[in-house]
Amino acid sequence: KLKELHFPASLKTISCEAFSDCTSLEQVSLPEAFAVFDVQSAFRSNPFKGCTALRAFHVDSRNVHFQAYEGVLYDKEMTTLVAYPNQKGDTFSIPAFVRWIGNRAFEGTMVRSIVFTDNVERVGMSAFRNCSQLKQVSLNCVVDIDRQAFGYCTSLCKVEMPYAETIGLYAFER
């Protein structure tokens, strides 16, 4: 039962679903050289999809691409939320420094409630896909909602998006 991942210093990329359904995995520590989560394609999933016990990400302080804050993974500038661990909590307030929710950042997590600040402008591709417990979202200042951003959020019953300019293909597909 895999509980922790500590990668070699040479690790640069983790591909889609590399650790999918490792249900005992609790912590992931990313090394200095790590640079890429391969989740850009419409057919790729979060490398940690289905890791239901995942509590926190940790990043080597010398990494120039990513950093973790309170267990959540962000880009180095902390303007993009990259990945949210499933056991972080079922309610989360997006920090004020975040501008973009990254592709597949919350995919498949058990989050029930997300509080968006007025600084979030974009929700990436499949960012909340398969978040079956998510009930409502208020996308205060979000302008762009990418494809499948909230796809298969089967409990979603209320969405407010007063400033939306672009809603992607299958953004709210059931």
Enumerate the language-model features and the residues they cover.
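Consensus positions within tandem repeat domains that build extended binding/scaffold surfaces
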Residues: 15-20, 45-46, 82, 102-105, ...
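Structural signature of tandem-repeat unit edges
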Residues: 1-13, 22-40, 51-72, 76-79, ...
